[in-house]
Amino acid sequence: DADVESQAVEIGQALTEILKMFETFSSPLTDILDKLPTPANRRVARARERLDETIYQIIDERRSSSEDRGDLLSMMLMAQDEEGGGGMSDDQLRDELMTLFLAGHETTANALAWTWYLLSQNPEAEAKLHQELDTVLGDRLPTMDDVRRLEYTERVMTESMRCYPPVWVMGRRSIGSYKVGEYTIPAGSIVLVSQYVMHHNEEYYPEPFKFDPDRWTAENRASRPKYSYFPFGGGPRLCIGEQFAWAEGILIIATLAQRWKMGYESKGPVELQPLITLRPKGGVKMKLERR
C-alpha cells in the first residue's frame, strides 16, 4: 500500500501550503497573481505535485489489487455511470480524493483544536466526558460500534462546532428573486451565509458564548429550527464527508480524552483567525496530563 502514515508530515505540509492559497481568493488581483512565478506560487505547485504523487499511487495500487475494503475509495472504484456504464477515471478519482484531503484535514484539525481548548476552560464538561468514557469504554480503545453509544462525546463535539464552526461562512447562488425584509435579492446573486453568526443567535442559543454540551439533548435539539445549526452546510450541497467527520471526531476525542486531560498553556483567550476556515490564531498550545 502507499504508505500514507510515514509521509504524514510531508502531506500535512503540502496541505497547509495549498490551503494558504485559498486565503487569497478574496483579492481582486487573484487571477493575475496566481499566474506569476512567485515563491508562494512555486511552493503551491510543489505541494500539489506531492499530493498528486501520493493520491495516484493509492489509486494505482487499489486498481491493481481489485480488493473491496469497504471504504469510500472502494465504493468510487466500483461505481458505474447509470447511462454509459463506465467507471470513474483516475483523474476523477484524484479530484474526489483531493477534496477529501483538503476538506477533511483543515476542518477536522480546527474542530479538534477548538474542542480541546473549550474542554480545558470548562472542567465540569470535561469531567462528564471522562465519566462517559470510563463507563462505556473502560480500558479498551473505542471502535466504530461505540460512536452511537458516546452520546455526551457527540454533544461535546456538536457544541464545539457551534461555538467555533470550522467553516464559518459559505456562499450560495440564489435560484430566484427573493425578498428579505426591505431588501430584494435578485436571481443569480451570490449570498454569503455565516454559520458563526447563526450559531451565536440568542434567539436559539441563550448565552451564546457559553460552552454547554447539554444544549444538544434530544429535547433541546427538537426546540430549534433545522438550519439554526449547519456546520456542514445543508440541502443538496451538504458536505459529502459529514458522517465520516462525525465518526472521526468522536473517536479521536474519545481516544485522547480517555487517557489524557488537556490544559491550556498560553495566557489569555484564544484569538479568532477567520480565514477560509475559522482558525485559532497562532494555534492552541496544550499541556497533556495523564489521567
Range-by-range predicted roles:
Residues 1-110, 128, 277:
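Cytochrome P450 heme-thiolate monooxygenase catalytic core
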Residues 193-221:
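Conserved cytochrome P450 K-helix/beta-meander segment immediately N-terminal to the heme-binding cysteine loop
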Residues 53, 57, 140-181, 202:
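Conserved cytochrome P450 K-helix E-x-x-R motif and the immediately C-terminal K′/meander segment
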Residues 13-16, 134-142, 148, 238, ...:
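Cytochrome P450 proximal C-terminal region
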Residues 40, 44, 153-169, 282-291:
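C-terminal domain-closing interface element
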Residues 98-99, 103, 141-145, 169, ...:
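Cytochrome P450 heme-thiolate "Cys pocket" and heme-binding signature region
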Residues 107-132, 243-259:
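Cytochrome P450 catalytic-core helices
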